[in-house]
C-alpha cells in the first residue's frame, strides 16, 4: 500500500480524493452485487447438485440391489455345490424339471460335457431358479441368470423372463469379459465384474453382473445375471431435464439414457475423483460425476448452463440497474460534501502528517529489533520483542554510552558487544512521537558477519602462507634442478666445439638433445607454476614482429629441412613494423606451436601466416599432420592433457605447452583457437592486440615499378602471396605458360627449371634451401620459402636498385664476416660450486675472454683489489657473502664495472632482486654459449667505449 506524501494537500486534490472514495464505494457496492449474484448462482448450483445427488443415490441403490442379488444367488449356488468331483448334488426332482439352455462361449467350449457332468446339479439349480422366479424374481426385476463352467467355458442359461435379447451382442460382450477375467491378475480374479450393454432402443440397456463360484478354494464356475435398465432407475421422477450417461473406468461412455445428444465426454480430471461436480470445458453444461460401487462404473448427470442461469437473469439485470443508480447518487453526493467535509480537516493536517512521517520511518527500518528511545534520557517508550531481548543484553555502561550517542546526534550507529558475546549493531534515526523527540533504533545481530570476517581474514592469511610456500618450493626446485643441469648442458656445448672421434659425436649429440628436452620440460613446469601462482609477468616493450618471425623461422628451418618438409612464412605487407608487447613470450608461444607442427607432420608442409585482423595481429600456424579428433580439441588447452590416439603417443612432452600458450596469450589480452581435422592437419590461430602499432608506408620501390615477373608457381597460397607482395612494390605479374619473355623479365618458379630462361633472371623457391638467396648459376637464384616476404629485396638486388628502408620493411640478411676478438676483456667468475665455476671459465675461454675465478663474495673482493677486472659474472646464492651483498659492496667501493648475476632460481622476484641490488643483468641457469655470447657482447662493447 502506498502512503500519500502529505496530508496537507490543496482543496482541489482533496476533492479528487473524495471522488476516488465515492468511486471505491461504488466499486464496493458493485462487488457486493457481483457477490450476491455469484451466491445466487452457487445456491442454484447447490439445488441442482442436490437433485443430482438424489438421482445418483437412486442409481447407487439400483447397483447395490443388483450386487445383493448376486450375493444371494452366489450363496445359493455355493450351498448346492459338493466337494465330490466338483459337481452339484442332485435334489428331489419332479416331472416338470427342465434342463437350462446351453450356449458355447468359445469355439472349443464343450457344452455336452458340461450337460452330462453337471446334469443333476443343473437340474437342481434350474428347479430352484424356477421356484425363485415364481416367488422373488418380480421383486428384483431380473431377465435371466446364467452359469459358466470354469473348465468347459460353456454357459447354462436360466431364463427368468421372456423378452427379446440381442444374442450376438450379448455373447460378444460376455466373451470379452470372460477373457478379461481369465487374464486378470490372481489378486483381482475374485472380484465381481459389472458392465452395461446398449439395448435396441435409446434410453434402454442391459446391466450385467458376474461373480465367481468356488468349491474348496477352487473356481468351479462363474455366476451371472442380466437386468434391464431404464431411465427411471437412475434419476428421480419430476426432476430437472437432465442428461444421464454411464461411463466405465476408462471414461468411455457406455450408454446414455436420454438419447445420443445427452452423451457427455468424460474429462481426465473427473476420473481421478470418486465424486466431481462442475462445468464442462466451455461452460456449456453443469455435470455431476459419481462412482457406482461396488462396480467400476460411474454415472454422469448433466444440465445445460442456460437452465442454471434461467432464474438469475432478472437478478443480473436488476443488479446492473441498481449499480447505475447508486453510482449516479454517489457522485452527486460527493460534489455536495466536498465543501463541507474537507475544509474543517485542514486543522488536523499537521498532526496527521507527523503521524504519517513516523509510520513511514518505522516501515523504512529493517525487519529486526525495533525500539523507540526518548532522546533526553534514553528511556524505552516502545519496542518489539526482539529489541526488548537485545536491550536486556546491554550492560549499564552500554546503555549510558548509547544515551550519550543519541543525545549528541553525531553518529547514527554504534557497535556493542553484549555480556554473552553477542555482537550488536545499533542504528537509529531521530524523529518525534507523541510530541517528544525520540530516536527510532534498529538492533541487528551481526555475530555471524563478524565471525565470517574473522574466518575470511584467517583464510587470507592461510592463502598468503600457501603462496609463500609455493614460491619457496619453486625457488628450491628451480635451483636444485638447474644447477646440475647447467653442468651437463654447458659441458656438452663445450664438448661439441671440440674435435671428437668417430662415433663419439653421435653420442654427444644424443646427450645434448636429451638434456635440452629435460631443460624444456623443467622450464614448462616452472612457467606453468609461475603462471598459476601469478608470479609470471608480461614485460611489454617495443619490438618488430617481422624480426621475431625471421628469428623463429631461422631457428626451425634446419629441423624442417631435415624432416623433408616445407616451411612457408607469409608476412603480409600491412603487418606493423613495430608494436608494443612482450616479444620473448610471443616467440615462446609461436615456437611451441611451430615445434608441435613439425613433430606431428611427416609429409607435406607447414605454413606460418602473419597478417592484420582488425585491431589484432593474427598469426596462423597450419600443418598437414595427423590432425586432432573433435572430441579432444575441447581439452587441448587443459594442463597435462595429451592427445591419446595413434601417433601422438609416440611424442614426448608434459602436456603443458599449449596450456602455457593459452595463458600467455590471455595475459597479452589476446586469444588462441584451433581448427583440426584428423588426417588433414591442424591450424592454430593466435591474436594479440596492436598496441602502439607503427605501420609501413605504402610506397613502391623506385626502379621496380613497371618491371614484369612471370609466375610459374604451383602452390596456390605461395602464388597469391607473391602477387600481393609484388603488386605493393609496383611490379607487374603474369602467369607463365610458355610465352616469349622480354630481356628484363624475371621468372619465379617453385620447382626446378626445365629450360634455360631467356630473360634477366629466374628465381627458384626451394623448400630445402636455408639462409639468404644465392645465385647458384648465372641468372638463376635460389630462394627459401621461409622468407617469401623478402622477394622484393632480391628483385631490387637483381635490378641493381638501392633499397629504401621506408619502401621495404626488410632487406636481405648479410653475414658478419668480422670475427670477435675478446682477449682484451678480463672477466671475474664468482661461484661456490667448483663444477659450475670451471664450466663458466671454459665457456668464456671458448669465446675468447680472459677470466679469473673466485670461490665466494669475500674471495671476489680480494681478486678485485689485486687485478683489473672488466666484467663480474657472479652466482647469486653463495656462502660467506652472496652475490647481492657482493654487488652492493662493489657499488659502495665506487666501481661501475658491469655485474651480471647467474642464478638457478627461475622466479621473476629473484631477477628483480638482482637488479635492485645493483646488478646490470641476471641470467638463469643453465647458461648456453649463445646466451653468454650475446649478453657479454653488450657489456664488453660498453667497457670498450668507457676505455675510449
From Swiss-Prot:
It is a multi-pass membrane protein. GO terms for cellular component: plasma membrane. The chain crosses the membrane at residues 21-41, 314-334. Residues 705-805 form the ABL domain. InterPro entries: CheY-like_superfamily (IPR011006), HATPase_C_sf (IPR036890), His_kinase_dom (IPR005467), HisK_dim/P_dom (IPR003661), HisK_dim/P_sf (IPR036097), RcsC (IPR030856), RcsC_C_sf (IPR038388), Sig_transdc_His_kin-like_C (IPR004358). Its main location: membrane. PROSITE patterns: ABL (PS51426), HIS_KIN (PS50109), RESPONSE_REGULATORY (PS50110). Component of the Rcs signaling system, which controls transcription of numerous genes. RcsC functions as a membrane-associated protein kinase that phosphorylates RcsD in response to environmental signals. The phosphoryl group is then transferred to the response regulator RcsB. This is Sensor histidine kinase RcsC. It comes from Salmonella typhimurium (strain LT2 / SGSC1412 / ATCC 700720). The lineage of its organism: Bacteria, Pseudomonadati, Pseudomonadota, Gammaproteobacteria, Enterobacterales.
